[in-house]
Amino acid sequence: FKDGVLVRKKSGNRGLGLQIDDLYMITPYWCRKAELLKDPKWLDRAIEESLDYFDYLWDRDDKLMHCLWLEENKAPYGLYWGRGNGWYIMAVTDLLTFIPQDHPKRNEVLEDYRTFINGIIRRQGKRGLWHQILDRPDVYPEASCSGMFTYCILKGVNEGWLDSSFHEAGTKGWRGLLTLVNDEGEIT
């Protein structure tokens, strides 16, 4: 796109698109590249990408991330995919561990992180799990997105990005995940 955000060509002649899980595919790479090469431009690129994804995909009304933004629509598109939202917040959580405290964009990334966490907690089910389609409680609870959200919430509490009141949602998620593990240690 003109603003430099990373996109991919979508199948079926749908043009270019921004897909939520792509952020996790590139952000950790750029963060580690910045660290290994001692070149902050790669960290800055990861930060800008994260901020752009939030701007393109965040639904301010539903407080969730759309899974796709298609150039032809000029708007977010698709479901509130649980796993995709999980990959998004995993990328942002990982990114926050690399951004120095004095970086001029740190607070902006932290604000997006907190906004997302506040939105996702609203969708947590009674058992502590999240559904594969986040705004559809009739769709099955999904282990991988529940694990990602639980990790990111508890990491935020431990790092001081979230206050201790978020610990309850994190432990509720953990208890929910434990109900999915059978006696052989397999996730069911």
Identify the function of each model-found stretch.
Residues 1, 17, 136, 141, ...:
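CBM-like carbohydrate-recognition segments
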Residues 1-7, 40-66, 110-128, 169-186:
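Long, well-ordered core segments of solenoidal/helical folds
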Residues 5-21, 63-84, 127-148, 186-188:
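Carbohydrate-binding/catalytic loop surfaces
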Residues 25-39, 87-105, 148-162:
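Well-ordered alpha-helical scaffold segments within catalytic/enzyme domains
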Residues 30, 50, 75-76:
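Active-site mouth of glycoside hydrolases
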Residues 79, 83, 100, 104-111, ...:
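A short glycine-/small-residue-rich loop at the edge of a beta-strand within enzyme catalytic domains
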Residues 89-135:
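Oxyanion-binding "anion nests"
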